[in-house]
């Protein structure tokens, strides 16, 4: 459907229609969430809905503030000894899980171990750890094979997969298996009995939570749950969601369609802006285990034809204030962004790309593209790629589904004939791709890597050198080399940056600018 036709249809939906939900009750934040909460394990998956859920339910030892400084969170503090080879962490007093049990050092060690098996930064940390020891219930020590000054950054990061602390018995679950208990120590308790996958989810304030006695800053500081309840309603249809916000039936919406933002801004009862720091990046991910995209020349052919502006206009409209081209594997406008090796994305040459497809020996193998229709940005990018692949001569099987199903299917390492996949789109926020440590998508460590499983020993060696570097100038040089190598093998294709608007009632106060949506610090005025 064209934008003009869609907006004409939307005008009808803003007329009186049956109410979707009752007006927000006092003490309850009613949220329209654009994507299904399909998994409750933030280590097993990195989908945004699970990440948003996890920041309410779980807590971190350390966290990152608005100035990108790592600060204590669950930790009271830490000491560094033995020439940087031993870190001793002390937990704050009074920490407890939602089942009433105290948070202990054993829980922290088990949680670090499980997280480090899946996360890219965590895997590097794990390779440097010589051992982890319980000192007592509130203190534990991490012993390193050699100094690793980035250890606090790994434990406190907000990006990709976070090191959330779980009870020891839960963290003992294989990192390749989803957990069956969902008990954290964060400011909100998840109400499992009220969870209806695909429809709704709810949380209640955890009265046993002891926040830090300091102002919130980014995701650091005092995580004060000011609302008694948070309720998500999953509304994938943007016209329905917009009409509900216009009528004041919900308090917050996290995925406003760009075309609808001007109309919502005309409503004197709404605020429309993005609280997400640095915006969001679109990406095209390949399955590199199976044909046809185990052939790097075919990946390069697609990159040669890509025009980021086509993708960003599809997502964010024609106003360049909403989006930007970013031909970097690291977030543009940050220290590690560069132009190294990115000439292939400046080609934008469909005829050259067609010739490359032919020269690469493509034989008409079926390409299964999975597309999440309940995420407006992912849906928009998916249509652009579908058209591009067809123009390049690929035999495309376009599978439209929801993000939760996509997240389940992308786990499969089977060929397409057995339910596997070939390509999909995903989105990551600015802090998720700041540098080689946190950019999960650039990892090229094969079977132990993120979905798509690219393998590139050269890139991995360069990444290891980046971690070992001690000077900023050396790290910048190595980051540029990593990017140049990534453009040769293409673990993914960067598709640009956009600023996703959110909308909330003017009665809602305390919305924090952060790397990810957060629900603590938010209150509602009468």
Enumerate the language-model features and the residues they cover:
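N-terminal lobe/hinge region of extracytoplasmic solute-binding protein
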Residues: 32-82, 113, 183, 494
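Surface-exposed binding/hinge segments that line
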Residues: 90, 124-171, 175-196
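Structural transition elements
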Residues: 188, 321-359, 373-380
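Ligand/substrate-recognition segments at binding pockets and active sites
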Residues: 197-199, 237-238, 256, 346, ...
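Ligand-site clamp/hinge motif
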Residues: 211-263, 395
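Periplasmic-binding protein-like
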Residues: 289, 293-334, 380-381, 486-494
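Extracytoplasmic/peripheral linker and loop segments enriched in polar/acidic and small residues
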Residues: 300, 344-346, 397-408, 436-506, ...
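Long beta-strand-rich cores associated with HINT superfamily self-processing modules
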Residues: 504-526
């Amino acid at each position: 459907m064209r934008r003009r036709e869609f907006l004409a249809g939307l005008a009808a939906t803003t007329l009186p229609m049956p109410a979707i939900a009752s007006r927000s009750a006092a003490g309850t934040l009613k949220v329209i969430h654009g994507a299904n909460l399909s998994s409750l394990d933030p280590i097993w998956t990195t989908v945004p809905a699970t990440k948003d859920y996890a920041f309410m339910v779980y807590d971190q030892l350390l966290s990152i503030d608005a100035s990108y400084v790592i600060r204590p969170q669950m930790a009271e503090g830490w000491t560094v000894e033995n020439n940087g080879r031993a870190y001793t962490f002390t937990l704050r007093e009074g920490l407890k899980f939602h089942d009433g049990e105290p948070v202990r050092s054993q829980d922290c060690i088990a949680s670090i171990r499980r997280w480090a098996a899946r996360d890219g930064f965590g895997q590097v940390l794990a390779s440097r750890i010589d051992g982890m020891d319980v000192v007592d219930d509130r203190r534990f020590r991490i012993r390193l094979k050699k100094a690793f000054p980035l250890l606090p950054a790994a434990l406190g990061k907000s990006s990709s997969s976070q090191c959330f602390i779980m009870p020891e018995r839960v963290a003992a679950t294989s990192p390749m298996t989803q957990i069956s208990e969902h008990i954290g120590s964060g400011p909100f308790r998840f109400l499992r009995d009220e969870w209806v996958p695909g429809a709704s989810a709810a949380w209640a304030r955890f009265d046993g939570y002891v926040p830090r006695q300091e102002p919130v800053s980014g995701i650091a500081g005092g995580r004060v749950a000011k609302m008694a309840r948070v309720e998500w309603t999953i509304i994938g249809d943007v016209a329905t969601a917009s009409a509900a916000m216009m009528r004041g039936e919900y308090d917050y919406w996290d995925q406003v369609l760009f075309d609808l933002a001007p109309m919502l801004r005309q409503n004197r009862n709404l605020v429309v802006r993005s609280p997400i720091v640095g915006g969001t990046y679109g990406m095209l991910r390949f399955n590199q285990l199976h044909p046809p995209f185990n052939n790097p020349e075919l990946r390069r052919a697609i990159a040669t034809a890509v025009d980021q502006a086509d993708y960003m206009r599809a997502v964010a409209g024609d106003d360049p204030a909403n989006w930007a081209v970013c031909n970097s594997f690291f977030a543009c406008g940050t220290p590690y962004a560069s132009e190294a090796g990115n000439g292939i994305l400046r080609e934008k040459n469909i005829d050259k790309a067609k010739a490359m497809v032919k020269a690469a020996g493509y034989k008409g193998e079926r390409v299964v593209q999975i597309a999440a229709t309940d995420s407006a940005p992912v849906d928009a990018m998916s249509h652009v790629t579908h058209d591009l692949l067809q123009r390049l001569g690929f035999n495309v099987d376009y599978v439209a589904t929801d993000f939760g199903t996509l997240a389940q299917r992308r786990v499969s390492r089977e060929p397409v004939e057995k339910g596997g996949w070939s390509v999909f789109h995903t989105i990551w926020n600015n802090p998720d791709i700041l540098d080689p440590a946190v950019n999960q998508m650039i990892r090229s460590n094969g079977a132990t890597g993120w979905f798509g499983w690219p393998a590139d020993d050269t890139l991995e060696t360069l990444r290891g050198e980046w971690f070992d570097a001690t000077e900023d100038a050396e790290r910048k040089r190595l980051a540029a080399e990593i990017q140049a190598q990534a453009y040769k093998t293409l673990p993914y294709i960067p598709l640009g940056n956009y600023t996703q608007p959110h909308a909330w009632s003017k009665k809602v106060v305390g919305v924090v600018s952060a790397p990810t949506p957060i629900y603590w610090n938010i209150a509602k005025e009468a």
